[in-house]
């Protein structure tokens, strides 16, 4: 699938000392060539593969106002990106962890959807070997570890301004403060709660099975069907569609799964992104804490694994061979 770049601008923030964050602003847009296209294709791929949070602009968002003006032609894209970089610098300077980076603004189209992607990318040093086998230093953009990224679905924003999901962003691997400053820069708030939607789906499935009075095996088979559908959607980059999921599932009683979900008021969207971690609970039990980490198939509960809620005791009958081998060697006096 091709990614068509409309406009792209690069600027730079440089941290001089603990108090100073300087800007280096380009005077022209970045020419679109093969290298730029490859970079954006990689950034799009990396971003699309990561779990994202959803949001929407606040009513007083300066960035949203400037973007509207840019879209109307009242301001050109370069001027918009330069002014936005200044606002980003001012916001970032409030935080003690502030670091510099390459600030990227790219308007592009992918699969008939128009996007604006904004990112702060780290510039890293590495070594290269030339044809004469000499070693020298080179610089590269660390796209694979980029975690300060937001993307605005311009098509959704302009055709459905009441949407709570036209803006997506990464919360960042180094803590909430990273996403906080970026959300402040965007003047946006969190919108659609993907995890809550997935948890609501699991609750609806369990209560649908309860109402049909399915036995343990029937219930788990039903949960497996839901998991298979959701996993296929996730792997293909598609969202969970309640209507199509309901068509995949055999009705239990007089109501389809979609009708049951609507009647019970789970407040599920017609479609929403799949959350891999939440959906895993359909087929597995997992948990960790106090030096213990457990993960097992749900079907094993009541067969090889038993839980006594009165004493909060888990009994496992038949340990995995590699675990059993370690236990035998340790208890027989072997030092591993």
From Swiss-Prot:
Entry coiled-coil feature ranges: none
Compartmental location: Cytoplasm, Nucleoid
InterPro entries listed in its UniProt record: Nucleoid_associated_NdpA (IPR007358)
One Pfam family hit: NA37
GO CC annotation terms, alphabetical: bacterial nucleoid; cytoplasm
A GO molecular-function annotation: single-stranded RNA binding
Region (Disordered): 317-336
Domain of life assignment: Bacteria
Principal location listed in the UniProt entry: cytoplasm
Record's keyword terms, sorted: Cytoplasm
NCBIfam families: PRK00378.1
Matching HAMAP family: NdpA
Family: Belongs to the YejK family.
Name of the protein in question: Nucleoid-associated protein ECA2747
Organism from which the protein derives: Pectobacterium atrosepticum (strain SCRI 1043 / ATCC BAA-672)
